[in-house]
Swiss-Prot record:
Protein name, UniProt field: Methionyl-tRNA formyltransferase
Disulfide feature: none
Catalytic reaction(s) noted: L-methionyl-tRNA(fMet) + (6R)-10-formyltetrahydrofolate = N-formyl-L-methionyl-tRNA(fMet) + (6S)-5,6,7,8-tetrahydrofolate + H(+)
InterPro entries listed in its UniProt record: Fmt, Formyl_trans_C, Formyl_transf_N, Formyl_transf_N_sf, Formyl_transferase-like_C_sf, Met-tRNA-FMT_C, Met-tRNA-FMT_N
UniProt enzyme class: transferase
Encoding gene per record: fmt
One function term, GO molecular function aspect: methionyl-tRNA formyltransferase activity
Keywords: Protein biosynthesis, Transferase
Gene Ontology CC, one term: cytosol
Species of provenance: Pelagibacter ubique (strain HTCC1062)
Enzyme Commission designation: 2.1.2.9
Protein family membership: Belongs to the Fmt family.
Length: 310
């Protein structure tokens, strides 16, 4: 392949897509990713998954703090004479002036069915809002976040057993399987991009840790959505006797009682719509994850306990 493509991405989600492009032998003169971050204790520098892969492939990996007002990176990209730039969960806004630096523009792979769930956390928000399906949208990058015209949408079902981790994996694999045919169609001018319907747009704002706290007066289905949508991080949690408990996996139960009441020793907890959730896997603050059978052996949370943070 003689076409030159720059790839911009950061998390594991983006890795299979970069691998697909590399294995197709496109010329990839550079990869952009977020700068390495220090660990919490400051002893280790953690590179992004994309940086690790790019270095393994001996691709020039560039990690600017920002592209905005960054003349050096602008000039670098300009001199590459690019055909296309592909962006997958890069984590930075692409400045308007960059968008003319590639002959076929900047293409973004977004993890939602646009115009639904524009923004930073589409996978989490779709699960938390009890959507039955999600997917990926292949779109042109415009001046505003996730508003550009869409070329293709690919859908998958969200199963009851899914969480943000499993859906992320499924969508990443799906994108890696679909990217080559879309890139080739872009180069051959065979892919038609259609403007989004802004009136149908919803927004997937960044997840805040505080959102993970479970309100037991919510309905049981919404609580399950929160648990699944926030797994593995930051996680859904409750406070009992000043200790935090993260619920890693749960399912709908069949008991009802007072809001926040523990209905059985294996932690079936009553919710706000006369339904309950059954905890399957849980993690006590500072401890390792446990399945519920292990957890209840030494737990202070027993039948008749009341979790009152509603």
């Amino acid at each position: 392949m003689t076409k030159k493509i720059v790839f911009m991405g950061t998390p594991f989600f983006a890795v299979p897509i970069l691998k697909s492009l590399y294995e197709k032998n496109y010329i990839i003169p550079a990869v952009y990713t977020q700068p390495p971050k220090k660990s919490q204790r400051g002893q280790k520098i953690n590179k992004s998954p994309i940086q690790i892969v790019a270095e393994d492939y001996n691709i020039d990996c560039r990690t600017p703090d920002t592209l905005k007002t960054n003349k050096e990176e602008y000039e670098y990209l300009k001199q590459l004479d690019l055909d296309l730039v592909i962006v997958v969960a890069y984590g930075q806004i692409i400045p308007k002036e960059y968008l003319n630096l590639a002959k076929k523009g900047f293409i973004n792979i977004h993890a939602s069915l646009l115009p639904k769930w524009r923004g930073a956390a589409p996978i989490q928000r779709s699960i938390m809002n009890l959507e039955k399906e999600t997917g990926i949208s292949i779109m042109k990058i415009g001046e505003k976040l996730d508003t550009g015209p869409v070329g293709n949408i690919y859908r998958i079902k969200i199963k009851d057993s899914d969480n943000a981790e499993t859906i992320s994996t499924k969508l990443s694999i799906l994108a890696s399987e679909k990217i080559i045919e879309n890139v080739e169609n872009i180069f051959e001018d065979k892919l038609t991009f259609k403007e989004q319907d802004d009136t149908s747009a919803t927004y997937a704002s960044k997840i805040e840790k505080s959102e993970g706290e479970i309100k037991w007066n919510d309905n049981a289905e919404s609580i399950i959505g929160k648990i699944n949508g926030l797994y593995p991080s930051p996680g859904a949690f409750f406070i009992f006797k000043d200790e935090r408990y993260k619920i890693l996996k749960a399912e709908l139960g069949n008991k009802s009682g007072e809001i926040g009441e523990v209905m059985s020793n294996d932690l079936e907890i009553s919710c706000g719509n006369q339904k309950s959730i059954k905890i399957i896997e849980i993690q006590r603050q500072g401890k390792k994850p446990q399945n519920i059978n292990e957890f209840v052996l030494g737990s202070q949370i027993i039948k008749g306990s009341r979790i009152t943070n509603v």
